[in-house]
Swiss-Prot record:
Belongs to the TRAFAC class TrmE-Era-EngA-EngB-Septin-like GTPase superfamily. Era GTPase family. GTP binds at residues 15-22, 62-66, 123-126. Residues 15-22 are annotated as: G1. Residues 123-126 are annotated as: G4. PROSITE patterns: G_ERA, KH_TYPE_2. This is GTPase Era. Residues 41-45 are annotated as: G2. It is found in: Cytoplasm; Cell membrane. Coiled coil: none annotated. Monomer.
Length: 301
């Protein structure tokens, strides 16, 4: 009996902030591995989500959105996005269903230098009239350089099957790199820290969310059978610390409640979550601190 062909490869998700890269990856792997919010720069690190079927295994690399850097952290995030193109088999350039803007034009120009196939993926098509979508697709066709132009909705699942089938056509034959039940290459503590940061993004406003970082200090079994997780939320100013803690500790308590629910859903077990808030002045422009909390710039040099 002839052995069934199996394909595998790495696919980078690229695009401006908040275009839906993390939402698409979470939909594809069937579980939250990348956090989402309506605020730009939600994703900071390269995160991989693993999709496995009987035909192929795809490692999707969700990158930070590309934008003009204003700090060491911003610079790190842009380099993380571009470095992800060095060792992938395909690039999915994600855009929203609107006329080509300067940001998308900038990224499209960068992608002309890429040696691997680039797909243009127009997300959020459930929010636009089909006739307008056709005009937008036509304007992107004129840019050239895209092997495929695919309309999808990452929230509604529209066009996802077609996207996966098209990816399969371009992937090389290869082995299954990860177990069928593995959905990310990141350790649990990384995803846990991201889930806590997601709740900060969702519950606080203005500059506070992007002035925060989360580090998991320990994950140990406790006597009561629950998993004990201790984490520190870092902010840049005393005033931000006050906002995170809230009046009478209410905000920090709500962050903890919401985070614990998400973490328990991820890990499938009861969790005792303890949170602390500390001030680390100008941490976003401190290379040694960035490295300490997981932003290792060596791999980007």
């Amino acid at each position: 009996m002839e052995e069934k062909e199996f394909k595998s490869g790495f696919v980078a998700l690229l695009g401006r902030p908040n275009v839906g890269k993390s939402t698409l990856m979470n939909y594809l792997v069937g579980q939250k591995v990348a956090i989402t919010s309506n605020k730009p720069q939600t994703t900071r690190n390269r995160i991989s989500g693993i999709y496995t079927s009987d035909k192929m295994q795809v490692v999707f690399v969700d990158t930070p959105g590309i934008f003009k850097p204003h700090s060491k952290l911003d610079d790190y995030m842009d380099k993380a996005s571009l470095s992800s193109l060095n060792d992938v088999d395909l690039v999915l350039f994600m855009v929203e269903p609107e006329e080509i803007g300067k940001g998308d034009q900038y990224i499209a120009n960068l992608l002309k230098e890429v040696k691997v196939p680039v797909f243009l993926v127009i997300n959020k098509v459930d929010q636009i009239h089909p006739n307008k979508l056709l005009l937008i697709m036509d304007s992107y066709h004129k840019l050239e350089g895209f092997k495929e132009i695919l309309p999808i909705s990452a929230t509604q699942g529209i066009g996802i099957e077609d996207l996966l089938n098209t990816i399969n056509k371009y992937l090389p034959e290869g082995p299954q790199y990860y177990g069928a039940d593995q959905i990310t290459d990141r350790p649990e503590y990384f995803v846990v820290a991201e889930l806590i940061r997601e709740q900060i993004l969702r519950l606080t406003s203005q500059e506070v969310p992007h002035a925060t970082a989360v580090a998991v200090d320990q994950m140990n079994k406790h006597q009561n059978g629950k998993l004990l997780i201790e984490a520190t939320i870092y902010v840049e100013k005393d005033g931000q610390k006050g906002i995170i803690i809230g009046k009478g500790g209410k905000m920090l308590k709500q962050i903890g409640i919401n985070s614990r629910k998400e973490i328990e859903h991820l890990l499938g077990e009861k969790v005792n979550l303890r949170l602390w808030v500390k001030v680390q002045h100008n941490w976003r422009s401190d290379p040694s601190f960035l490295k300490q909390i997981g932003y290792d710039k060596k791999e980007l040099s």
